[in-house]
């Protein structure tokens, strides 16, 4: 019966529905997935988290880039290249991937609370420091916790960092200017229709080719189907439209993250995407000026996925 409770092996009471969801989870980075509950906007939201590697090894938390096709699976090649003596952890942001996708007001504060909850969940009794690796638009979410949490970080690596969503980047206008687009896509009937048009395979292919991947051979029909599957899951339109319209932006100008990076209590490593769109590349360079270490890879905004092996080698190189 829906809503009935069962006792798991760990002795935790869960609803039958929750147990079924956990059993149906798939590995995305070659590890073991699990579901946890984190309170966001006054309600518990189911977040899917995955661990890979040695339980007692050096801890690495991998933050997926925020995008219409955001998924922890972006880190699979990176995870394959890392030493198995490390413990790698990644998760799907609320509203994306395998995590719950409720119709809530998504913004940078919600995702910052989510990341703080993940860090608290991972905190061990011996206070082992965590290596943060943040990709793309997840970077300002992590930097938003610089003052609060970074004393517990061994380092933060920011990969092809961005701080503005696509529409604010293209137009130069703040995210508030596009709140009407968010309201439109959130409507019943018309909202799903508009979102479906925006996640057609030709649109996704254009976006991935121009901004995300360098190698066009990656844009196979099978891979495009998988990207479309991620983007069209029930409830996915709410967080996705927030991202596209700048609703997830932590700030409207680069001065904010220049201030935040100076609040860090750990080293910062910026990995530049050499083939990023010009405006995004300029903003990456301003952040790199404040970093302790700078590297560059000939990729675009999805370099952590396309060049995961090279990225892993670059990060661990002394």
Show the residue positions of the predicted features.
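Hydrolases whose catalytic domains are alpha/beta-hydrolase-1, hotdog thioesterase
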Residues: 141-145
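Flexible "cap/lid" loop of the alpha/beta hydrolase fold
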Residues: 147, 153-192
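Conserved HGGG/HGGXW glycine-rich cap/lid loop of the alpha/beta-hydrolase fold
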Residues: 45-98
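Conserved serine/cysteine hydrolase catalytic core
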Residues: 236-286
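Catalytic active-site module of serine/aspartate enzymes centered on a nucleophile-bearing elbow/loop
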Residues: 287-318
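Alpha/beta-hydrolase
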Residues: 201-256
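N-terminal cap/lid segment of alpha/beta-hydrolase-fold proteins
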Residues: 19-46
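Active-site loop/oxyanion-hole signature of alpha/beta-hydrolase fold enzymes
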Residues: 90-137, 163
């Amino acid at each position: 019966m829906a809503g009935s409770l069962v006792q798991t092996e760990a002795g935790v009471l869960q609803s039958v529905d929750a147990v079924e969801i956990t059993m149906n989870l798939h590995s995305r980075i070659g590890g073991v997935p699990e579901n946890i509950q984190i309170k966001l906007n006054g309600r518990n939201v189911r977040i899917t988290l995955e661990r890979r590697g040695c339980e007692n090894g050096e801890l690495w938390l991998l933050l997926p880039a925020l995008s219409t096709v955001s998924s922890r699976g972006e880190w699979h090649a990176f995870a394959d290249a890392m030493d198995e003596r490390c413990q790698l952890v990644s998760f799907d942001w609320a509203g994306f991937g395998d995590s719950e996708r409720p119709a809530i007001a998504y913004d940078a504060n919600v995702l910052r609370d989510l990341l703080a909850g993940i860090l608290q969940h991972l905190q061990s009794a011996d206070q082992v420091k965590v290596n943060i690796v943040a990709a793309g638009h997840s970077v300002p979410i992590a930097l938003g916790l610089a003052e609060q949490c970074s004393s517990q970080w061994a380092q933060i690596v920011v990969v092809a960092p961005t701080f503005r969503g696509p529409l604010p980047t293209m137009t130069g206008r703040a995210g508030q200017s596009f709140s009407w687009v968010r309201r439109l896509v959130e409507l019943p009937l018309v909202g799903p229709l508009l979102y479906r048009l925006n996640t057609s395979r030709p649109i996704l292919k254009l976006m991935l080719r121009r901004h995300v991947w360098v190698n066009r051979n990656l844009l196979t029909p099978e891979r495009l189907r998988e990207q479309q599957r991620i983007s069209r899951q029930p409830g996915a339109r709410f967080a996705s439209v927030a991202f596209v319209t700048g609703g997830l932006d932590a700030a409207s100008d680069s001065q904010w993250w220049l201030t935040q990076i100076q609040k860090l209590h750990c080293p910062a490593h910026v990995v530049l995407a050499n083939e990023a769109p010009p405006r995004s590349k300029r903003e990456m360079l301003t952040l790199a000026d404040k970093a302790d270490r700078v590297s560059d890879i000939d990729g675009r905004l999805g370099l952590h996925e396309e060049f995961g092996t090279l990225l892993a080698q670059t990060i661990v190189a002394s």
